[in-house]
């Protein structure tokens, strides 16, 4: 059975890129913002890994991370934050909120794949 990758990004192009790249190994579930992603998770769905954008309407990336990490069922799910912001202060904010990693857009899908799989492998021990 495929693992589930939750993609939280308001850009349809990013959702499409990630779906096409990861669909062989994951069931990819796109959500347009943190609020919709939390609603999906609160309905009893689970994710094995999450890729989330920093800047989104309704609930942005940092707010999503905080809600996710306060959820008993989802607090340990590997999460990589994507952003067009290169400032170290943005990266530090995301990591402090509970992101496991941070990548700047544009990103290399293969690198993202390796980072996700490495995190998931470490959790399986």
Positions of predicted regions on the chain:
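Receiver (REC) domain active-site loop signature in two-component systems and cognate sites
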Residues: 56
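Two-component/phosphorelay signaling modules centered on CheY-like receiver
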Residues: 12-30
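Acidic, metal-coordinating helix/loop segments flanking the phosphotransfer/catalytic sites
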Residues: 32-49
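C-terminal output helix
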Residues: 107-116
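Short, conserved "switch-loop" micro-motifs in signal-transduction and mechanochemical regulators
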Residues: 85-86
